[in-house]
Amino acid sequence: MGQIASSANDGKNNAILESFSKEQIMDLLSSRCLTLLRNVEITSITNKLNVTSLREKNVVTPTDLALLLQLSNDMDRDNSSVNESFNRALKILYESTRVIGSLPFLSNYTKTDTSGGLTIQELLISSLVHSARYKKIFNSQYDYLKLIFCSLALPRLAVETNSEESSVDFLSDKPKVVEQVRYPIREEDSPDIRSKKVKWDTFNIINNYDDIDISSLKVNAYDLVQIITLFLIISSIPKMKRDLMHQKLVGYIERWKEFEVYGLYILKYININLNATNLQTETITFEEFQTTFNRCLPNFFQNGFSILFKEGLLSTVVAKAGSNNSSKDIPNNPEPQKQEEEATKKKKFKLPKFEESKLVNAASLSYISNVVSGLGSSIEISNQNLIKLYAGTEAGFSIRSLESKIFKWQAPTLFVVSGKRLKNKTIDTNMRYQQFKTEYPQYFRSSESNKHDWQNDNDKITYAILINQPWKNSNKKNFGDENTIILSLSPRLDFYKSIHSTVLNGESIYFNTLGLGIGFGNTQPVNKNGVKKYFPGDVSLTIEANLEFAVFRHIVASSANTSTYFERSHQSQVRSSDFEDRFMITDLEVWGIGSTKDLEEQRKQWEWEQKQAEARQSVNLRSLGEERAFLEMVGLVGNHNSSGGSI
């Protein structure tokens, strides 16, 4: 390490430069990461790793990492015995941690023995990155998503090159690197002091990702689905006691396939032609990866990794003596919990507890909530603020039944409709559909194919609509606002946000009780002189009055006769395509979404209605005694074998 004299051209403030060896930089960054840890965290981590110092050169095994990140609580259990796909995700996570831990020399991973282990130093650097503390020392413009992609792609590159010499001139190949420091580094400075003097935010090796040609890197599609699935599971578990969270985790891992299908739907936003049979052979480029996750799920990886490392390695929760499963927080304040329990006891009326349904379960809910959050909606969706208002399979597929169930809810709702794509035989022979077809204007000519290559006869089609305003009868005028979002949930992810218009004002929804059903993105339909007619928008979802058929329409070129309430798809293979999803409805559900205030107001409203119903019943029972004698006289109640009476 040596100081180099700087000139006036070195920078505006006559920057001080130092030359560093590769080993010196790695040691300095490791020391800087240690300074970002609190003393209680250092103590906790050393205990978990069973070491005396975090500067030791011990190796952390995949099993160790699973334990440290709370993905396992059994050191002797083989993860592959839990679930093969889960085991694959753990291996991906382990290698990703090794790559990020090699900062700032990311290319080191491809030059070392890929069978090597994760060092404590690499684990700490990776944990500081995933807990977002890197922002305290790196450039504010540092691209976390790019780093994640490198960490997922470099292991594949290392295997492909099979330790062959690389022709790429990495910065890390140079024996000495000259970088800027805040103050001159002195011989007597401790490692921590030296690490703080370095201007990490100007390090070329860091800001240029070790000069790796990221455009040439690729991630295996199957591997990406597995890591997405893992994070969908992790994000589905609410904050609770450690042992309860782990019970949930184990249960959801056993349901891996349920979550995995939504991981595939997310990836189909990148490439609509991906499917379960070609995942192993398909790859994803950085441009595809970046575009999709910045557009739909910008914080998905940051949130997933953050939960793992903050709740795992960096957590200061310690186990109770004599127990491997139960734990307590330090410090622990029982007062809020006591107050909550007392408040619960006082409530006579309880809101329905969340129970999974055919359309909304742990897997689909994690998928929906992550996408809604990623699209920037202020409406938070979780199993802790959802109440099922209507399910067609329970209450019957009737517009009146639907109206009676959802119109009293005065907060946002999630409307989910699902069904089977209509096949040509059904389209040609089903009389009820033929009637709907005469009312819904045809866009495609009869001679044109009504499906694209990515639309299959056996598709299960599911759409969800996030609605911010309360429902109401709208036979003449639409309602809604610009917070409404249409989501395509299956067989692929897509989204259609409300456009901003001072004319339309986001009033894109109608609930028609005059035999014209429900529409999103349509102009008001007409029922005149017994003739019904729909006016679908360019991007719209139309549900006919019997809740039997639905059509999602996506037309690229606007027409003077149609309205446009929603943005067209941004998916690269769909945005320029005209298409329709016509399906026969098999399930329809509406869920109320409430804040704490909304839920409390709704509880009071339902409690009042319950009291009114009980009061009416009480009045009826009391009056029945006085009127019974008269009713028996005229033969309406009592002894029906008698001839009755007359007055």
UniProtKB/Swiss-Prot annotation:
PROSITE patterns: TLDC. Its main location: cytoplasm. Residues 358-594 form the TLDc domain. The keyword Transferase does not apply. InterPro entries: TLDc_dom (IPR006571). GO terms for cellular component: cytoplasm. Residues 325-346 are annotated as: Disordered. It is found in: Cytoplasm. Belongs to the RTC5 family. This is Restriction of telomere capping protein 5. It comes from Scheffersomyces stipitis (strain ATCC 58785 / CBS 6054 / NBRC 10063 / NRRL Y-11545) (Yeast). The gene is RTC5.
